[in-house]
Amino acid sequence: MNKAFQYCMKVLVTGVAGQLGHDVMNELAKRGYEGVGSDIAPFYSGVADGSAVTTMPSVALDITDAEAVTRIITDVNPDVVVHCAAWTAVDLAEDEDKKDKVRAINVDGTQNIANACKAVDAKMVYISTDYVFDGQGEEPWMADCKDYAPLSVYGQSKLDGELAVAN
């Protein structure tokens, strides 16, 4: 194939200041994809390890702001959004004063990303967790398993995020 005609997939990654987003961006760079990172900070604020993610394009994005999500995803116009942004402090999610914030990020923010992806016909990769299950199963988990049983606010919020994406 003539290199002049090869297409470079553009991928927007949310939550690049976190471990998963950081690693996804570095993997995209290794594979030659065009990666654009996003996080709530106006500049990359994750691990300063000198890896590719520290110099790749990044945009500020509060995923709980539906208008901002639509604007950024429309402007970036990615082929794919890998949604790594989330409230991940599992134990703190149980605090009464944190529950609304957890839901705003993990459910409403995820819904905002899904809606914007649909509007620009971008694929969306959603990262969930095993916390959507209670850990009591005795058989290997199957990809289409619906035996959800979250035991925590965090687990419920990630399940609700999954359902938002699926719908």
Spans of model-derived segments:
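N-terminal Rossmann NAD(P)H-binding glycine-rich loop of SDR-like oxidoreductase domains
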Residues: 9-31
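SDR active-site strand-loop-helix element
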Residues: 14, 38, 81-85, 124-129
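Rossmann-fold NAD(P)-dependent oxidoreductase module
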Residues: 23, 27, 116, 164
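A short helix->loop->beta-strand "cap" motif at the edges of active sites that frequently abuts
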Residues: 120-122
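Catalytic helix-loop patch of NAD(P)-dependent Rossmann-fold dehydrogenases
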Residues: 100-112, 132-167
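Rossmann-fold cofactor-recognition segment
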Residues: 51-65
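Conserved glycine-rich Rossmann-like NAD(P)H-binding loop of the short-chain dehydrogenase/reductase
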Residues: 33-45
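NAD(P)H-binding glycine-rich loop region in Rossmannoid oxidoreductase-like domains
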Residues: 63-105
